[in-house]
Amino acid sequence: MTNDAIPQGARPASRILLLDPRQRLLLLQAQRDDGYRFWVTPGGGLEPGETFEDAARRELREETGLESSLGPWVWTRRHAYSWNDQWCDQYERFFVVRTEDDVIRPKAPDGYVVGYRWWPLEDLRTSTEAFAPRRLTELIESIIRRQYPAHPFDCGI
């Protein structure tokens, strides 16, 4: 899905592909109640009246303490999942953000976040950790090289 429409019934959310000057990607380690851990990009749901861009800036500030201008919207993702016994159908837009600061100062971290890490591309390629979206390690290479898609595309679950 690459148009501006939010699928009916889906929770809209913004996600951030945050890159530092060394071209490392910031990921947050999330943990479910059952102990399963995986790595995700910063981001979260839109609040009433927010645009996707507003939510991306707010989530960046809350989850990292950083303020930065947004780059392009490059990916979308719709996925349904169970989180701690609750069903969620989520539609996400991913925005590129480049920062000069690699010091994270979370202001309002979500309770499920148990860690942060700046990931070099090579570490992403060789890791056996779980990432969301699953194709993150494949798709982030062109973003690091500033080769952005002409239109946002579905990055898969």
Kindly give the residue locations of the regions a language model identified.
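Conserved Nudix-box catalytic region and its N-terminal flanking loop in Nudix hydrolases
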Residues: 23-62
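Nudix hydrolase/Nudix homology domain
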Residues: 34-37, 108-157
